């Protein structure tokens, strides 16, 4: 980790992989190899042993936290003498491009939905709240896509606050990684889930990170439990390049893909292109905006080579 170890020692309890795996207790494995195949991201090699060692203990921890919040809600209901609208428990997952946030989110969604106390678990990504492509071009932000200023933060905060207020139905824009843009006239509908997982680059950001809007609410103000998926930048860059090369022969080959022109690149040229994108966009965004929020997370999942978790840090 790039932050001094003494900071982590002060803020977190550290668990090596085997120590963390021992906290699973009797939580059953509810995913099959076929289930896991559907949840894996591009170029990720997550196995059932990874689910057993890392994600089952985490699902147990989250279940305990959700249960504690539900009990506090019952006590408040008794005190107030009425039952307020159902408010979901909100989990955020942050981290760099290519670190595997989406896979982590999907696995947790699948595992948490098997707990009888909270069977309805929804998942959204903040990608849908990126400004439309035309608006990014108008604002001169196309080369800063993924940076905080490229998101419609007002709409994102309004969405998450409506969820937290217990509104019956709330909609979120849907993003296409093929067209590199929002899908017009399509929405994801959230209808009072027990748990909402929100995954994105900047979901740990606070007013301290915004020199302009220091007083307005941020997504992090509405989150009950936050997770940061971490890895050394050299690994992140390698994973990004590997994923780019996979997309070149996969998603980029579609004529509808915004990046279709990349599908015609040879290996050497494609590698150089991906490396340049990392060095000019994703790397600086990580350094300036994403990594500085890491120590705000309740839990840090530290990855080593091959996307395998080797350490878990739990906030004291």
UniProtKB/Swiss-Prot annotation:
Signal peptide from the UniProt entry: none
UniProt-listed GO biological process terms: coenzyme A biosynthetic process
Keyword Nucleotide-binding: yes
Alphabetized UniProt keyword annotations: ATP-binding, Coenzyme A biosynthesis, Cytoplasm, Kinase, Nucleotide-binding, Transferase
Top-level taxonomic group: Bacteria
Predominant cellular place of this UniProt entry's protein: cytoplasm
Reactions catalysed, as given in the entry: (R)-pantothenate + ATP = (R)-4'-phosphopantothenate + ADP + H(+)
GO cellular component: cytoplasm
Keyword presence, Transferase: yes
A molecular function GO annotation: ATP binding
PANTHER family: URIDINE KINASE
UniProt protein name: Pantothenate kinase
Organism: Shewanella halifaxensis (strain HAW-EB4)
